[in-house]
Amino acid sequence: MYSEQNPARHYIALTFVWLLLGAALGLHFPDVDTRFQWLISPRLLLHRSAVTHGLIVPSLLFLSARAKDKAPSFRSFVIGFSLASAVHLCFDFFPKGWVGFALIHVPLYGRTTALFSQAWIMLGVLACLYLAFLLARRLIELAFGAGILAASFIVSAAENAGSVLNALTLLIVAGVAVVTARRFRKAASEIIR
């Protein structure tokens, strides 16, 4: 039951729930075309679409969360969604071969090359992690975000046993790159001031 005497506990619980909800959706959103193929026309969305497998949807959610300074619940949802999407993309970066459905599909263009597909997925991983990091305003969001990232990885590892070590390595390297870029950006902005 909600206690007016302890709103911090209520905030923490809501933050966790919204992060978890965002992660649950973000972890499987890139494959929405295969899960709802009976609902979505293949002319609109094919597997590994650039629309779902990359930075487009997380970026739109990020802009929406920042533009209107929405409630912390929406911000938490977007953080969870972005982190889980990054995990999904880390596993998608290691297909059995860069041919056919492993390649990114651009609507109205078709399948791209292996190099473009790899670059697009890598850019998506970095963008998703960076956007989540930018949205986190409180230490509790960073702490829960780290937990959500780990939980998303565990769920994906159970579903994709073949490339666990590679995906983990990619996630760690991308995470270090994002933290380094954020610190560099912060230091550069302080020098400019």
What residues fall within each predicted segment?
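N-terminal membrane-targeting hydrophobic helices
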Residues: 1-193
